[in-house]
Amino acid sequence: MSDLVQLIRREILLLTGNGESANSKHEIEEIKKQIKDISADVNRISNIVDSIQGQLGGLSVRVSAIESGVSENGNRIDRLERDVSGISASVSGIDSRLSELGDRVNVAEQRIGQLDTVTDNLLERASRLETEVSAITNDLGSLNTRVTTELNDVRQTIAAIDTRLTTLETDAVTSVGQGLQKTGNSIKVIVGTGMWFDRNNVLQLFLSNQQKGLGFIDNGMVVKIDTQYFSFDSNGNITLNNNISGLPARTGSLEASRIDVVAPPLVIQSTGSTRLLRLMYEAVDFVVTNNVLTLRNRSVTPTFKFPLELNSADNSVSIHRNYRIRLGQWSGQLEYHTPSLRWNAPVTVNLMRVDDWLILSFTRFSTSGILASGKFVLNFVTGLSPGWATGSTEPSTTTNPLSTTFAAIQFINGSSRVDAFRILGVAEWNAGELEITNHGGTYTAHTNVDWAPMTIMYPCLG
């Protein structure tokens, strides 16, 4: 820098000694002023460069400290060193640019006439240099932050690895006892003759000759038994099953009930190992029909319909004791039929015959919904009280309807109940099925029906 100043001074003296005009002096003064500004700028740049070199020196010290503290993280330190090398390269670029600036000043010695233009160019380059130096400062701050963060991460990783190594050192199995074998990181059980692992990887005894009565069930060894004759009690003892232990008592019972001698007309016939008990009878008078012993010739006893009945004790015929009034009952499924709806409901109907009429008394019952028409069916083939035949319910006439009745009902729709009535009439009896036609009445929308007790009757001789 001092050489540059001396050179400029010599040039100024040379110009002065040549007797330039006042205008030249003015230009020289301007040049001096610009040179002073350039000198001030160069000094400021030098100070900035010195500051950067100081920061680089501090950074080198910190990098050295990091290298000594985290030697095991060489890869990351290498990256930091490459970053520092990049910074050094940037500083070398700055030195190169400063050398270029010196070269340009040397050119200014030879081209003093173009000093204004060179000075402007120098100011522009100096401004760019300041920008680059500021960028370098920012990069150094980012690098410092990154180094600090990476160092903390490295310390945390080292601490975690140290904890895991401590755990491994504590839990690691280095030797095994008798019956075990350690191969690398695996521990095996030494299995001798007479032992094996089942499909659940459980060590078991190996019995090669289980036919002798021993075997395994789950994880236990048991005695093999024939469960048809033997079982285990609550104490694990082998006991006889009931079908075996009860044989003596059953044998004694059979022996006690054995018939050795029979009286006529019975006789015992033996054929080989078979003993047959036979009934002796006179074939002229008796015959076995459908495994039943009957007379070959007998009088046919007539059958009687109500109100007549046969007293088998003395073979006498008399008026039935329930003539004029006879009680009974039928229980079964009340069927409802329409082309689009069909359901069954269990009901119990009390039967009462008065003279030549059969009265059906229905108790209170509930059913599913009905339509405005349809028919109800009672099947008297089954469900009648003892003494009541299916034919005793057959009507004595085929007039349709045989009779009608008004049935009080309630139509139910959710919580709503509507009182109503239906007109029912006995229409037909066919092979024990009595049809009751639904002729109409009041009607409303509903889901279920409650039927009040009702009676319906029709002519019937029984």
Curated annotation (Swiss-Prot):
Subunit structure of this chain's protein: Homotrimer. Interacts (via the head region) with human F11R.
Subcellular location as annotated: Virion
Name by which UniProt lists this protein: Outer capsid protein sigma-1
Role played: Fiber-like molecule that attaches the virion to the host cell membrane by binding to the primary receptor F11R/JAM-A and to sialic acid containing proteins (coreceptor). The interaction of sigma-1 with F11R is required for NF-kB activation and apoptosis. Binding to both sialic acid and F11R is required to induce maximal levels of apoptosis.
Keyword Coiled coil: yes
Modified how: Undergoes dramatic conformational rearrangements during viral disassembly in the endocytic pathway.
Family according to the record: Belongs to the orthoreovirus sigma-1 protein family.
Keywords associated with the record: Capsid protein, Coiled coil, Glycoprotein, Hemagglutinin, Host-virus interaction, Outer capsid protein, Viral attachment to host cell, Virion, Virus entry into host cell
A GO term from the CC aspect: viral outer capsid
One Pfam family per UniProt: Reo_sigma1
Keyword match Ligase: no
Regions annotated as coiled coil: 18-49
Entry-linked InterPro entries: Adenovirus_pIV-like_att, S1_C
Head: annotated span: 318-462
Ranges where the record places region Tail: 1-317
